[in-house]
A protein has these predicted regions:
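Helix-coil boundary and N-terminal low-complexity module in membrane systems
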Residues: 1-152, 213-237, 241-245, 249-253, ...
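Selective recognition of hydrophobic, aromatic-rich stretches within alpha-helical transmembrane segments
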Residues: 77-114, 154-223, 261-285
Length: 288
């Protein structure tokens, strides 16, 4: 009699497409796990009818509005298509504000299908959401002011190095944008644990970009960054403690959200992915 054979082990990258704990190893394993999370989120949304229904409403409503704007013009077919795409691109940030509560409810509903304990939705008001969007836009802009000043100094005192510095500036800009894509995605994935103490304090450690400018001449600038970034202390703490994970997660989310209409379709997947990341990081954290 031959001994029964066991099923071959599932390769790690394929296992990352199913809900499960963080990899035991850091480095490339954690980066790959983070990179796979948006695809995991998409897979869970498609497989769960309730999540798919909740995710479809923002897409249909927003796309329908853009279609109505295009049909309201007197242009031909090509002109209407151009207006549809222009409206889509111009209003691309709007779904985050208009459908914020839908995405928050989606985040809470996704926890059980992801193998996590049930929680309730975190529901900030519209005024808070608008204020946070303005804060983030300001942070994205003024966070690059030192790069612009450095470029001006290079042009003034070392013109020959200016072309090379342009590439450095673009790389820094891309990194800064990716950083805030991750922060926004993680923010959308937050839920409320009913058993947690009310008003739990956010981490008080300054984020890296605040500490970077804590030099005598730039302390006021550093303080401004600290005040503007206060709503995202939880997310920034996770970025600092799991850099490989958030780099992979950010690259995966950025690839999904790079094209406006694709971003609208895949944003629910990014929200579900963020829920899974936050849940598994919480599970892996040592008890307080």
């Amino acid at each position: 009699m031959t001994a029964p054979t066991s099923a071959p082990p599932v390769p790690a990258p394929l296992a990352w497409l199913a809900p499960g704990p963080l990899p035991a190893r850091r480095g490339l394993a954690l980066l790959g796990w983070g990179l796979a999370q948006p695809l995991l989120g998409l897979r869970v949304v498609v497989r769960e009818p309730a999540l798919l229904k909740a995710a479809a409403w923002p897409v249909l409503l927003f796309a329908g509005f853009c279609v109505l704007v295009a049909l309201g013009t007197e242009d031909d077919g090509a002109g209407r298509l151009d207006i549809f795409l222009t409206t889509l691109v111009t209003l691309a940030p709007a779904p985050v504000l208009l459908f914020g509560k839908t995405y928050r409810r989606l985040a809470a509903a996704a926890r059980v299908p992801l193998g996590l304990s049930p929680r309730t939705a975190e529901m900030p008001g519209l005024r808070t959401a608008i204020a946070d969007a303005v804060r983030q836009a300001i942070l994205l802009g003024i966070g690059l002011v030192p790069v612009w000043l450095a470029f001006e100094l290079v042009q003034a005192f070392w013109p020959a190095a200016a072309p090379g510095f342009v590439w450095i500036a673009w790389a820094v800009t891309g990194f800064w944008a990716l950083h805030w894509i991750v922060v926004e995605a993680l923010d959308n994935g937050h839920t409320v644990d009913p058993a947690a103490p009310v008003g739990a304090a956010a981490p008080q450690v300054d984020p890296w970009f605040v500490r970077l400018w804590q030099v005598p001449l730039l302390r006021k600038f550093s303080g401004l960054l600290r005040r503007l970034s206060r709503p995202w202390r939880r997310e920034l703490q996770l970025v600092a403690s799991h850099p490989e994970l958030v780099l992979g997660f950010g690259l995966g989310v950025a690839a999904m959200l790079a094209v406006p209409f694709v971003a609208l379709v895949f944003r629910p997947a990014a929200v579900v992915a963020a829920v899974h990341v936050l849940g598994r990081v919480d599970e892996a954290a040592p008890p307080a």
